[in-house]
């Protein structure tokens, strides 16, 4: 058989050819750039495998070269490996590319519309990659340059492009915690939407509304976030990119969780997980995004053990894709740290939780400014863990050192939250509550009481009298009154209120009830009401039996391996529950 008739190339022969090209890289550098994008990428990947990062960096820092490499779509997973290795090596390839693109856009400002359109398309792909890789500031620079090009032509095509650009810009600003700029971006997108509408044109609003929901959720404006999620769900139609559908389902699920509509949240997030795995595969970053939100749901419905497993799975994917000092890896470490802390709270074994909290902080401080808002939540988690370790410590000097470190972390988190959100915000209230618990551990009881009351007042005004967050703070204040201030009457009222909220939201087997029940047993012992002591010992025994039966078998990942409903059915089911009709998928 003649060689020309072969329908495939033996892998070893191909790899040998790639290696030969790489061995002669200096001489063949220019010729490499004329190769098809897939082969060109394979040459660059071989440079990466051989540790020749300086040469790889010099290639990737050229916009034309990198734009061509981005066209090798089936190599994206490997491209993330190379890119992250360069960033870890100190090659600022993300900022170099963003700067190069920005300069190119300024050069072509006077060129015709076709040249600008081509540049916008390159910008969307480049900015999309930088966004996916977590380099939000550089992605923002790229999208701002695209938006500038869009504004130079007041015609319909560029209005559509401007809307798309605003959606992408809003996403990276949300990711980078630039919430004040996010609001401006949404308003600008609406302006272009209105222009299109006046000319009888409609752009799909699902992605835009989904990003607005993410913005409002991050700012703890939960009622508004929920409202806009409904609007986003109405916009899900046939032909919409799967990525957009998955992201809208994720945001809607989170909004349902904080509204304590757990059945709706479960249906939405399970379908999002199924859809992401089915479409993107089980090693894709988008699948890990859905797992993090699935973990959030499980944690909030008190299925803590399974949430830890899901968060670990998400972290594993992100480490395999990005590795190194990457923001996506840091957020996965933080989520796993907090769920591990909650999971091991009663056992006191916090080594794993502390490891992940410190990894998150280490990565964030390496790649972001020291006053970045993302540090607030990571520092908060580490402070919670250190406080528990300190309480169990038998060495007084070590205990005081750990408590002081926790105090410094909590204060830093509080200042970052107040700067970003102001005083009257759920996130700020959480930090007050955490400080209240810490002051109790430090035996500063008046300061502790003040912090808890402040947290309760803010949460009640924002979330209502019967929210989970309110119950947490009420229970913490009850503990302070019971164990340290001998205010038993006040403590009893608060415990009973916390229990009532917990049972109403989560049922009789809710894990948080244990601490309230034990608190009441101690309280009734202190005042000599032994009938009540006996009663709550029985209640606690029944609670333990319920816990043993709860979540004993279910594998959360196995639970989402199939979907009993289509996307259209999931969307319609959600909208019908809101008494809203959506467009047909």
Swiss-Prot record:
PTM note:
Rapidly degraded by the proteasome upon overexpression of a C-terminal fragment of APP.
Q: Which membrane topology term applies here? A: Peripheral membrane protein
Q: Which UniProt keywords apply?
A: Cytoplasm, Cytoskeleton, Membrane, Microtubule, Nucleus, Protein transport, Repeat, TPR repeat, Transport, Ubl conjugation pathway
Which Pfam families does the protein's record reference? TPR_10 (PF13374), TPR_12 (PF13424)
Q: Record's SMART domains?
A: TPR
Task: List, alphabetically, the InterPro entries matched.
Answer: APPBP2, TPR-like_helical_dom_sf, TPR_rpt
Q: PROSITE patterns of this UniProt entry?
A: TPR, TPR_REGION
* TPR repeat coordinates: 50-83, 120-153, 206-239, 288-321, 333-367, 429-462, 471-505, 514-547
Listed under GO cellular component are:
Cul2-RING ubiquitin ligase complex; cytoplasm; cytoplasmic vesicle membrane; microtubule; microtubule associated complex; nucleoplasm; nucleus
One biological process term in Gene Ontology: intracellular transport
Ways its activity is controlled: E3 ubiquitin-protein ligase activity of the CRL2(APPBP2) complex is inhibited by APP.
Subunit-level organization: Component of a CRL2 E3 ubiquitin-protein ligase complex, also named ECS (Elongin BC-CUL2/5-SOCS-box protein) complex, composed of CUL2, Elongin BC (ELOB and ELOC), RBX1 and substrate-specific adapter APPBP2. Interacts with APP; APP interaction inhibits the E3 ubiquitin-protein ligase activity of the CRL2(APPBP2) complex.
Compartments where found:
Nucleus; Cytoplasm, Cytoskeleton; Membrane
Q: Name one GO molecular function term.
A: ubiquitin-like ligase-substrate adaptor activity
**UniProt-recorded name of the protein:** Amyloid protein-binding protein 2
> Lineage of this protein's species?
Eukaryota, Metazoa, Chordata, Craniata, Vertebrata
What this chain does, per the entry, is described as: Substrate-recognition component of a Cul2-RING (CRL2) E3 ubiquitin-protein ligase complex of the DesCEND (destruction via C-end degrons) pathway, which recognizes a C-degron located at the extreme C terminus of target proteins, leading to their ubiquitination and degradation. The C-degron recognized by the DesCEND pathway is usually a motif of less than ten residues and can be present in full-length proteins, truncated proteins or proteolytically cleaved forms.
- Source organism per UniProt: Homo sapiens (Human)
Could you tell me which pathway this protein works in? Protein modification; protein ubiquitination
Query: Which domain of life, per UniProt?
Result: Eukaryota
